[in-house]
Structures are given as structure tokens and as C-alpha cells.
Amino acid sequence: MAEKENVHPQVISSFPTPSKALKLSEKSSLKDVQTDNAAVPLVVDETSYPEPTCEFYGGLLGPQLPEAERFVLDPALVEEYRHKKPPFGFNGLGEVVYLRTYAREKDNGQSEVWLDTVQRVVTGTFEVLQHHVVNKLHCHWDAQKAKERSEDMFRRIFEMKFLPPGRGLWAMGSPICRKKGFAAALNNCAFVSTATLEKDRVGPFLFLMDASMLGVGVGFDNAGAGSFTVPGPDDTQPTYKFMIPDKREGWVESLKRLLKAHFCHTADVEFDYSKIREMGTKLKTFGGTSSGPGPLINLHKSIRKILVGEKGKPISVTCITDIMNLIGVCTVAGNIRRSAEIAFGEADCKEFLDLKSYETNPHRVEYGWASNNSIFAKVGMDYSDACERVRTNGEPGFAWLSNMQAFSRMNGKPDYRDQRVLGGNPCLEQSLESMELCCLVETFPDKHETLEDFKRTLYSALLYAKTVTLLPLHWRESNEIMLRNRRIGCSVSGIAQFITNRGLHELKTWLEEGYDILHQYDCQISEWLCIRQSIKLTSVKPSGTISLVAGATPGVHYPESCYYTRRLRMARDSPLLERLIKAGYHVEPCCVAPDVTAIVEFPVAAGNSIRTTRDITMWEQLSLAAFMQRYWADNQVSATITFDPETEGLHLNQALQYFQYQLKGISFLPRYPMGAFKQMPYEAITKEQYEEAIRKVKEDVSLSSANAIAETVEENQQTFCDNDRCIKL
């Protein structure tokens, strides 16, 4: 990847690569810098990162249209909704999650309110559509149809009948996309295979870091293990020093130089971190503050230590996963760049299965948590060894690659549409080729009175997701795949609520008719935009913060309790805290980091009649996942099955024997008593406790008038992986 011709100013391959010690880019210069040992040549990279040639979407969509012709959302529509109350969910929890996670800072320094965010997202979507039709296709733009479609999308997002992914709420129509051209920021997740390591020894690692620093969750495999012997740096050449530019590309370039030294037997490299801005410096485009050079320094030290020990050995499963996990730790530590990882390994590889055994691999305690680990299960295999491990800590998960390649929906009719698929994203709701990204969008069937209204929502949801596929990325290999596949993940959430209110059979009807109409819409939209129809359209994402905003149960998951306390972690200096206290919510210092983090408690009522995870067996949860895989998801269903280790753990092997023919992927989580640990994200309470807590909440206190965006504080305890690390830039 890194050696190919540049296709975009931001692409990795625009970096100069030293052949011998000191082959520099044309305008770079050499200086002697004294180190502890001797004078080391310094590579000063001053010209490798040109800015986009056009401020409008980084020049990706062509020149900006004349002002009189540009798409503008009807001001009358915006005014109509200005004083309408957004339907945030769960007694203020949804609004706080929105303000904390997705509301951007406006030019006047104030935080967006929901109306502002919806206006920005819809405007950004139709800007992309207009420029695709006018600039790329040179076709007629029907302003009246655009007005009708944009207004429908606006209403359905405002009313939370569907929502773009958290990344879309944060980035669509923002400077991240409009000025910088970082289209990857609108895509949720990706996958990269290491099978190419013999030919390209650094590319998969660079892709994962570059994508992670844009907030894209990345899955990876260990197919490249054993493909080459780690030679170590070339000691016959002098070590040189590289001054790291204060940009995302600079961080990735530093990793490239370090890995090339050890994997390709080139000159060793030392790093100068002096250009990286100090910790706490405000990040204007991406939001948040700089982490400083600390996480990158730790990454370099940790990887160097591992690779020195691997010299002369074939690259191993452990080495590949260690490097990927350390990159994940670095990007999570990088303040606002949150991301997630999943590692895939072979079912019979004991080395892979032992990666989360910290008795066997004590050195991995500090970073092994950075990925969920899943095995590529084979239909008909013996699951007993893996299931014993699942009983202990919930891993590994299971991915049936043969089912992913052979089936769309698991309805007994293989179509082999996706034979190039090699893995999936961190939550495993998307089948993906290597270096393929995906865009997800979330609908809420239970927020619709009629099936016909739900079908109309599906049009707007698909139009948003399809629009994201129009924006090329800065990876050539990814563009080649994504232009061919146009893969979409149109998801449904609040399934437990729908079943409770209308029944499973009604859900089956909505899913089947919704799936059929989506394919009709895809044909219409693809024809209008002169692009290919999507290879697959539907998924069930695990959801998380997005479902909290809308007040929906996440994906296919049932709530932990009818009444519970939901705790959020927030920065102690967040401007939201004062208003939350004034509004009557309980706030206390975090027991782990009391000086920097506060805990806010929200009383939540999931509903008297809804069943909870305590009422539903492991077998019923698996059956619901299989039901959704049969009637809705042609990609995959992301489901975490909770189970009682004592009463149900012994049945895991038998359960997988039955459901291996009905699923593409599944993960498990041992069930522990809620409240077993202090300040857990969820804690069951009684109806009386809920009513007492809710009486203290003052509805007349506005939370959205805080004048700045609250810092996001990561929640490692989140059950489902669609949390801050996965979806927030």
C-alpha cells in the first residue's frame, strides 16, 4: 500500500521513504542533532503533507458551486422545528449523551442543540448529493425533489425515527469533511487482512493506525503469521533521526519508518517529537484537546521492545496482535480519537486462543484489552475447548467465515455474493473484504405507528448511507473495493420494545417487507446516482450511545432490568455538570479518577411489561439473533449473548452445534450480579427507588444551554462495543 502512487493529498504513500539511511524528499534537509551517543542525521520533513487544493470536501467533489445554486435547507422548515422539543430518551439521559458526545462547537463558541446538528447533517448530505450529480455526472439537479427529500430526512432524524451513526452526527457537514476531505470519518468500521505481509510487510499495520486515528474501528486477522522472518534493522547503515510532523499522517509515518527498519532490514530510526503540540492544546477541527506526544512515545518504545525480541524469528500471531493492540492503545490514549479492534484467529491455533490468558502471556495485561478476539469457526468443528474459555471470560467470539461468504440472509439459500469477504468489523455486524470500510445507519421500528411510515423512513436512511459511499477515501485499495460493493448496513434497534408492544410475528412482517422495499429503493437511488447497487444492505448493529439518544433498547438486546440506574462518566470540568446538579441528577466523584472524572446517575424505566436479560434464557437470545439473521440482516447480526456460567455455561457447546447453521457471528458474556462492583454502568433498582429518583429531576432546567461541549470520557465497562471508543472521532 505504502509504495503505490498517491491518489489524494492525505494518502499515506505521499510520505518519503528512506532507501538507505538518508534518501530524502526533494525539499527535506539534513541537520546534525546530538544524541546521547553520537551525531545522528536528522530527516526534517517539511513538504510531504500538502493541504487540499479546494476547501470544499478537500477537493474530492470538484469546485464549489456558485452560491445561488448551492443546496440550502428550507429556512421555513428550520423555523418550524425551532421550538419543538426533541424526543430524547430515558429521562434526560439521551440529551446528555447527545450533548456530551455529538454536539459540535459552533463558530460563536456555543454548543450545538439538536436542531443545529440535524440541520448540519442533512445539509451536508445534500451538498454531497448535489455535487455528485452536478460536478461528477454533469446531470440535472432537480431542486424541487431535493427540497422534498431533504425535508423528509430532516423530520425523520429530528423525530429520531432513524439516526445516522454517531460518526455521521459528529462529522457530516462539518469541517472534518467539508474542509479536510476526511471521508473516512463518516465510515464506521473496517477490516484488514495480514495475508499480504510477505509482499507488503507494513501496509496492514499502517492502515489500522491511520483508520483508527480517524475513529474507524478496525478488524484484523493473523493470516500473515509465519510469512517472513523478522530481520531487524540494518546495522551496517547509520541510524537517522526523523522529526515527526504534528499531523495524523506524521504519526503514521513514524510507525512506517520503525516497522520498515525491523521488517525490511533498513536503517534504524530515532524520533524527534518536538513538533508535536503539547498535551491540552485545543484541536480546532477534530474537537477536544491534544494528548501530547506521550502516547506515541510509548507506542514506539513498546513496539521496538517487542521487535528486538522477535529478531531472527518468523513473525508470529502474538507479534502481529501485539503491534495492532499497541496501536489501539495509542489511539485511545490520543484523547478524542476513539476506536475499537477485533482480532480474528484460527480455531485450532492455541497461540491465538491463549492471547487473553494473562497467566500464559503476562506481558499482554497492559494492552490485550484493546481488541475483542474471535475465532474463525468451521461448521461441524468441536467447540468444547473454546467454550471452556468463554465460560471464564466471554472470549473468544465466533465468526463463521464460510457462512459470511455463502449467504446473504441465512434463509437456507446460499447466493455466494460475498465470496471475497475475509473478515468483519469489531462488532461483527458487517462482512468485509480486506481494506473495505462500511457505513451504518440505524432505524427504530417501534417509533413508527404504521408499516408504511417505517418504509418511508427506510428510504431516507438508505439515502443517507448511500450518499456516504459517494465520497472517495484516501486509500486507493479501499476505493477499488467500496466502489464495487457500495456496502451498506441499515440496522434496526429497539427490537425488544417492538416485540413487547406488537409481538414477534408483526416484527417478522415488518422485517420482510422492509427488506424487500429497501432493495427497490436501492435500485432507484443507484440508478439516479449512476452507481452500482449495494452488494448487501442490512445489518443489526449492537448500538449503544445512539440508542440511548433515541430512548431505544440497543439492537437485539434486552434491558438489564425494568428499572435501573445508568451511570455516565464525564470530565469534572464539563459545563454540563453544573446544570445536571441543578436539574436534580445525582453526581459524585469517580472512584477510579476522582480528580478528573465525575459520575452522573440517571434513573431509567425500560417499561413495566418488557422482559429483561434475567427473564430470557441463553437459548432464546440465540433464537432471536438467528431470527434477525434470517429475516433482516444480509450482512450480519451483532449480538452478545449473556449467560449464567453455572446453569447455562455447560450448554454452550451444544448451543453452537445447533446455531452454527443459522448465524454468521456471535459472542458471549458471563452474567454477573448488577451492582457487584462500585459505580457499574448499570445497576438494577426497584420501581420505588426509580420513582423517588425521578421526583428529584426538574424538567424546567435546560441542559442544552451549556456554552461548550463536554469532554467525552471513555467507558471501558460499556457492554456493547458501539461506545465512545468506536464511534467518536
Swiss-Prot record:
<dbReference type="GO" id="GO:0031419">
    <property type="term" value="F:cobalamin binding"/>
</dbReference>
<keyword id="KW-0235">DNA replication</keyword>
<keyword id="KW-1015">Disulfide bond</keyword>
<dbReference type="Pfam" id="PF17975">
    <property type="entry name" value="RNR_Alpha"/>
</dbReference>
<dbReference type="InterPro" id="IPR054158">
    <property type="entry name" value="RNR-II_ins_dom"/>
</dbReference>
<feature type="active site">
    <location>
        <position position="427"/>
    </location>
</feature>
<dbReference type="GO" id="GO:0008998">
    <property type="term" value="F:ribonucleoside-triphosphate reductase (thioredoxin) activity"/>
</dbReference>
<dbReference type="InterPro" id="IPR050862">
    <property type="entry name" value="RdRp_reductase_class-2"/>
</dbReference>
<dbReference type="GO" id="GO:0006260">
    <property type="term" value="P:DNA replication"/>
</dbReference>
<keyword id="KW-0846">Cobalamin</keyword>
<keyword id="KW-0170">Cobalt</keyword>
<dbReference type="GO" id="GO:0004748">
    <property type="term" value="F:ribonucleoside-diphosphate reductase activity, thioredoxin disulfide as acceptor"/>
</dbReference>
<protein>
    <recommendedName>
        <fullName>Adenosylcobalamin-dependent ribonucleoside-triphosphate reductase</fullName>
        <ecNumber>1.17.4.2</ecNumber>
    </recommendedName>
</protein>
<dbReference type="InterPro" id="IPR040763">
    <property type="entry name" value="RNR_alpha_hel"/>
</dbReference>
<keyword id="KW-0560">Oxidoreductase</keyword>
<feature type="disulfide bond" description="Redox-active">
    <location>
        <begin position="189"/>
        <end position="438"/>
    </location>
</feature>
<feature type="active site">
    <location>
        <position position="429"/>
    </location>
</feature>
<keyword id="KW-0676">Redox-active center</keyword>
<comment type="subunit">
    <text>Monomer.</text>
</comment>
<keyword id="KW-0021">Allosteric enzyme</keyword>
<dbReference type="Pfam" id="PF21995">
    <property type="entry name" value="RNR-II_ins_dom"/>
</dbReference>
<comment type="similarity">
    <text>Belongs to the class II ribonucleoside-triphosphate reductase family.</text>
</comment>
